[in-house]
Amino acid sequence: TLYFGNNVDNHVHAHDTRTGKRKWSFAADGSVRFAPVIKEGWIYFGSDDGHIYCVDAAKGTQIWKYRPGPSGEHIIGNGRMVSLWPIRTGVLVENGVLYAAAGIFPYEGLYIVALNAKTGRPVWVNDTAGDQAWGLQYGGMAPQGYIVASSDTVYIPTGRSMPAAFDKRTGKFKR
């Protein structure tokens, strides 16, 4: 099965690789900009609607969803409604923990999260990351891109700037 997100129709699709036929589609309420992650029969991804989703890979049904941002506020971006705290990073799932980042405007707040991959419940949340990485005088940190990690650090991509590093166990900003 081939799984892919679509930033035009707001869906994650599953297609049979032999026939090309669609098995299922799951609709988010915003663009799905990054490839989903598949682990142990579940699919994880983020959306411009500000939610992180967990979907059953076989059925395409939602298992859980989590909103890192403080509210469901939306703005217009490129002619579409977008959360003030969209998920503009890929998600990373390691050892039963999902890592993601929400937000594009540092002055509105950014949210770096570690969630229990099975339940969607927070392991930790860093809600002070907006000006930590480079300071607001340099534009702050705006998470964009794929997250990577080492044994003790989660690296959040920040578009054109250097990635920001966070302690994998606590979420505390490192550098």
Question: What label would you give each PLM region?
Answer:
Residues 42-66, 117:
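Hydrophobic or amphipathic alpha-helical targeting/insertion segments
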